[in-house]
C-alpha cells in the first residue's frame, strides 16, 4: 500500500486532520536502537522521537515486558513487590524531600494528579504556566496548552501564562540578569493577580528545559527566582519531566536539578517505560499523603505488574 492510500485510509478511519509529520509522511515499519526503517528499507537516524528513552526495541526492555506478560497482569489493589521495588528505586534518584510516588499510564494523567495535589494543598485554583507550552490532553491539562491558543493565553480564568524565558527574542528590551529578573517578575505579577481576583494561587508548572517553547538557554537565576516567588506565596513548583527527565540533559538525572532548585511535585510520562504506557508522579510526602487521604484515587493500569 503506497503512502497516498495509507493517508486516505487514515483520514477515513481517524479523521481528516489527524496529525502527521513532514510534507511527505514517512511509513515507518521497524525500529532498532537509534534507527528507524521505512517500508522501503530506508534507514533514518531518530533524533526526534521523545519516547523510546533507551532506544527502539531495546532487548532488555523487550525481555522484561515479555517475561511479565507471561507471568501476571493485574491492577495495583493487590499486594505486589514490583511496584514497591521500582518506586523505591525511582524516588532514590531524587532529592530527599521527594520521597513518595504514584504510578500512572501517561504524562497527561501525571499532570492531572499534580494539579489536583497543588490545588488541594494550597486551597487556591490558580495555575501558572508558560505562554507556549503543552502538558497533556485531558480537559484540565489542555487548559495549559497555551502553544495551541492564538494569543498564548488559556481560556480558563484559573490559568495564567507568563512569557517563557528567552534571550534570543526577548519580551523586554533588556539583557543579562536584569532580563531574567524581568521574566521572573512576570510570575510574581501573575501570583498577585490570582490573589486579587479571589481565585487564589495553587502552583506553577514548567517543563524545566522548556521543550515546547524551543529549548531556550535559561540560567539558574531565573528558575531560582521563580521558585522563590512560588514558595513565598504558598504555592508548589511542578516540574514536568516527561521530556527532560531520566538523564536526558546529560548532566543531571532530572531537568530541574540543573538550576539548583528542588521541585515539590515531578510528573513523568512514557519515556519511563521506553515508550510503553508507564508514567508517574513523585512528590513531597506531605503533598502525596494529603492527596491520598482526601481522594479515593486509583488507576487500573498505573503501575500494574
Each model region followed by its residue ranges:
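Conserved N-terminal phosphate-binding loop of PLP-dependent enzymes in the Aspartate aminotransferase
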Residues: 1-305
